[in-house]
């Protein structure tokens, strides 16, 4: 690869996170000749013994258009399959971006002897379960390292969401960085609309805007049909098509000393805003 061109690995906790947060940036990176891959980590189905908790039922009912008391284990696997299909359709709008989906289950599906770690929304946006920290996170880190034995990638991890899956991956990104991997972070949309603090020393935020890609980003987001109600409320498709709801801004966190990353990312937007 040309020394001026780089390979980027974007880490998406769930099927929609990178498209919502980074789609325009991905497209401009590809346009400039860089290589981009998206690795969706929590794309697996729950185990057959899993008994859905309150939050799993709530989300599945909302996504599938059912009542909560109708939700059974099979519905969860149906939902995961549908979300995977939506993700594949979304990335057809971004030709050239490589995509890989891992089989680690979403937080709301993780369990011990059939019982969920995270039963409520408060649990889901709280502190990661000790078993996730001690057992699950090291497995994720080991897999991520196996993807880059030649250390050719610049890794782009989620930064600011309080969702336990995002928190685990933020920690994984910091650990990879401590081992010498080049790492930067992105603020997850729509979470950054309420909270946008990356509590690490030596990092600065870069805001990118590139309106030329907005129509394609909008079309890609619209493919995530099961998620639109939960993300954007009633008449979400109309709001998106009318130019509302989505943000043109895409936010990244880059180490102050990473001159290569700053050079590449400042070139991606007509007027990048450093804060």
Curated annotation (Swiss-Prot):
Catalytic activity entry: 2'-N-acetylparomamine + H2O = paromamine + acetate
Q: What are the recorded Gene Ontology BP terms?
A: antibiotic biosynthetic process
Q: Does the keyword Ligase apply?
A: no
- Transmembrane feature ranges: none
Cofactors (names): Zn(2+)
Question: What's an example of a GO molecular-function annotation for this chain?
Answer: metal ion binding
Positions with a binding annotation for Zn(2+):
14, 17, 166
User: Which Pfam family, giving just one, matches this sequence?
Assistant: PIG-L
Q: Which InterPro entries match?
A: GlcNAc_PI_deacetylase-related, LmbE-like_dom_sf
Top class in the EC scheme? hydrolase
Going by the UniProt record, its keywords in alphabetical order are: Antibiotic biosynthesis, Hydrolase, Metal-binding, Zinc
Supply the EC number(s). 3.5.1.112
The record describes how the cofactor is bound as: Binds 1 zinc ion per subunit.
Query: Where does this protein act, in terms of pathway?
Result: Antibiotic biosynthesis; butirosin biosynthesis
Q: Keyword Methyltransferase, does the record have it?
A: no
User: Gene3D superfamilies under this entry?
Assistant: LmbE-like (3.40.50.10320)
Q: Name the family.
A: Belongs to the PIGL family.
What is the purpose of this protein? Deacetylase involved in the biosynthesis of butirosin by mediating deacetylation of 2'-N-acetylparomamine.
Tell me what this protein is called: 2'-N-acetylparomamine deacetylase
Report which gene this protein is encoded by.
btrD
């Amino acid at each position: 690869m040309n020394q001026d061109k780089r390979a980027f690995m974007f880490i998406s906790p769930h099927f929609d996170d990178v498209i919502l947060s980074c789609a325009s940036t991905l497209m401009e990176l590809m346009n400039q000749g860089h290589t981009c891959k998206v690795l969706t980590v929590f794309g697996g189905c729950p185990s057959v013994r899993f008994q859905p908790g309150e939050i799993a039922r709530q989300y599945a009912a909302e996504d599938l258009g059912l009542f909560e008391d109708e939700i059974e284990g099979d519905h969860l696997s149906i939902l995961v399959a549908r979300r995977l299909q939506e993700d594949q359709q979304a990335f057809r709008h971004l030709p050239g971006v490589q995509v890989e989906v891992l089989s680690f289950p979403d937080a709301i599906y993780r369990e011990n002897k059939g019982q969920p770690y995270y039963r409520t929304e408060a649990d889901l946006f709280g502190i990661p379960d000790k078993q996730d920290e001690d057992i699950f996170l090291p497995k994720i880190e080991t897999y991520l390292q196996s993807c880059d034995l030649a250390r050719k990638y610049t890794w782009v991890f989620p930064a600011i969401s309080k969702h336990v899956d995002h928190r685990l991956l933020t920690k994984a990104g910091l650990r990879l960085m401590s081992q010498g991997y080049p790492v930067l972070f992105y603020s997850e949309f729509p979470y950054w609309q309420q909270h946008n603090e990356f509590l690490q020393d030596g990092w600065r935020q870069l805001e990118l805007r590139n309106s030329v890609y907005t129509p394609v980003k909008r079309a890609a987001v619209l493919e995530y049909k099961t998620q639109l109600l939960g993300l954007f409320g009633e008449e979400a498709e109309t709001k998106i098509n009318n130019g509302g709801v989505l943000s043109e801004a895409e936010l990244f966190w880059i180490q102050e000393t990473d001159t290569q990353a700053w050079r590449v990312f400042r070139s991606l937007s007509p007027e990048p805003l450093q804060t």
